[in-house]
Structures are given as structure tokens and as C-alpha cells.
A protein has these predicted regions:
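Conserved donor NDP-sugar-binding/catalytic core segment of glycosyltransferases
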Residues: 90, 94-125
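Short, acidic, metal-binding catalytic loop of nucleotide-sugar glycosyltransferases
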Residues: 22-31
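A recurrent flexible, glycine/aromatic-enriched loop bordering the glycosyltransferase active site
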Residues: 118, 137-156, 171, 177
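N-proximal low-complexity "stem/linker" segments adjacent to membrane-targeting elements
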Residues: 1-23
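Glycine-rich, basic loop-to-helix element that forms the pyrophosphate-binding segment
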Residues: 60-77
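Short beta-strand-to-loop acidic/aromatic patch adjacent to the donor-nucleotide binding site
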Residues: 80-90
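Non-catalytic, C-terminal membrane-associated alpha-helical segments of glycosyltransferases
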Residues: 206, 210-247
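A conserved acidic beta->alpha catalytic loop
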Residues: 38-46, 90
């Protein structure tokens, strides 16, 4: 079984951090470490992380971007498979980690992401957005083009991250940008709904709109890249009849 590193980006996440770390520790897949990248918490989040045995890494809030914080956490980790998890995304059940990792049985898979189960505080508009994005779906999916991906509940191969780290200058959607880069190199992205987390933000509509305005230019940029960049020289894998065919 591959060694796994769970990397969590956090700032003032005391409300859910303990719950999330406790759920990780209950996983049946036990060959893992936890790295928490904190960007200036003032509510005791770092202390909670250390109390649960996580390795704590600090990043200056002035230097923070989602991609930079994740790259820093991965650079301080040792796993062959990296799981990126939001501090307020609590794994459901004891098979969550094993189900994410099982998606890498095929060498052609670059990333695996799981389902998001909205918390009770999710607003109507947040629920609608989650449904439209597909991250609440119960249907497994293998993406060959225009993948969704989520660093709130996703995993990727370290060797591919070393080749293509997350873009640190992007304001958001670094996960989707990376996934579509992997697809253009011939890799697959897998959606595994059984690897679920409880996750939502409880945000009002104005903040949801700001988040979308933040992310959509990056998503559009990655989509345009898929139209105009050259096709991969060598396909790593393909899917026939819903099954992986390694090449």
C-alpha cells in the first residue's frame, strides 16, 4: 500500500478542525501522515492540529495563495499519494481514505476526488451550486476531458505534482487548472462518490457570487487551453465501456 500524506490548509478553523482530524484518525487505511498548513490562525487552530498529532507548517498570510500553501505542505510531506482536504471537510465513515487511494490502482490516473455532502448550514444557492458542479453526485465518473476536481476532498500522485506543481499565482481554482493540465498530458481524473466528506460553507448569496467571480476566470483559462494546446504526444490511459485500459 502506498504511503499517504493528508495535507490540510487552514486559517481559523477551530470549529471543525478537531472533528476532521479525529475522523481521519479513525480510517481503516492507516499508512498516512497529516500535515496542516496554517496561515495565521488566531483561534487555536494550530494547537488543535498539534494535539491530534499533525505536523504543523506555517505560512505568512501575506504570502498565501491556495496553490502556494498546498505546494508548501506537499514539500514538507513524505507520501507517494497526496490527499488535499479542507479543514472543515469532515470524512464520512472509516473507508474514505482507502476509497480515494484505491482509485490509483491504474497508472493512468493522475487524480481522484470525492463527493461533498452539504452540512445543515448550506444555503439554497450553495446547494444549487454544488449540485450543478457535480460534487454531490452518487454516480462515479472517469474524466478524460474538462475535469472537475477538488482540493477540498481530492488526491493526486506526488510524482505528477513534482512535474506540475499547483500554480501559485492563481487566485483560486488551482485544482481544476491542474487537473486539466494532467488531462492534456494524457492522464485521467476519477470521481469516487464513496469517498465522501461533510462540507459546505453556509455562505450568503453575495459571498457565493464573489467566490464564483474569483474562480471562473481561471476555469475559463484552463478550458481555453484545452482547445488550443497541442494534444498529448502519448496517451497514458483510455476508457472503454467505463473500464480503464492502461497503455
Amino acid at each position: 500500500m502506498p504511503k499517504v500524506s493528508v495535507v490540510i490548509r487552514a486559517k481559523n478553523e477551530a470549529r471543525y478542525m478537531g472533528e476532521t482530524l479525529a475522523a481521519i484518525r479513525r480510517q481503516s487505511y492507516q499508512d498516512f501522515e497529516v500535515v496542516v498548513v496554517d496561515s495565521g490562525s488566531t483561534d487555536g487552530t494550530p494547537e488543535i492540529a498539534e494535539r491530534h498529532g499533525a505536523k504543523l507548517v506555517m505560512i505568512d498570510p501575506k504570502e498565501f495563495t491556495y496553490g502556494r500553501a498546498l505546494n508548501l505542505g506537499v514539500s514538507r510531506s513524505r507520501g507517494e499519494i497526496i490527499v488535499s482536504l479542507s479543514a472543515h471537510a469532515t470524512p464520512e465513515g472509516e473507508q474514505w481514505l482507502g476509497r480515494l487511494v484505491s482509485g490509483f490502482r491504474h497508472r493512468g490516473v493522475a487524480g481522484v476526488y470525492g463527493r461533498h455532502i452539504p452540512r445543515e448550514n448550506a444555503s439554497f444557492f450553495e446547494l444549487l451550486g454544488m449540485k450543478l458542479s457535480g460534487i454531490t453526485s452518487l454516480q462515479p465518473k472517469i474524466h478524460q476531458r474538462n475535469a472537475r476536481f477538488s482540493n477540498a476532498n481530492g488526491a493526486f500522485r506526488r510524482e505528477l505534482w513534482e512535474m506540475e506543481p499547483f500554480r501559485e499565482e492563481l487566485p483560486g481554482a488551482e485544482d481544476i487548472y491542474w487537473a486539466r493540465r494532467m488531462q492534456r498530458l494524457g492522464y485521467l481524473i476519477v470521481y469516487e462518490p464513496r469517498a465522501a466528506v461533510y462540507h459546505s460553507h453556509g455562505e450568503p448569496l453575495p459571498r457565493l457570487i464573489r467566490r464564483q467571480l474569483h474562480d471562473q476566470p481561471v476555469i475559463l483559462r484552463s478550458w481555453l487551453g484545452s482547445l488550443f494546446e497541442e494534444q498529448p504526444v502519448k496517451e497514458k490511459a483510455e476508457v472503454r465501456g467505463g473500464q480503464f485500459i492502461a497503455k
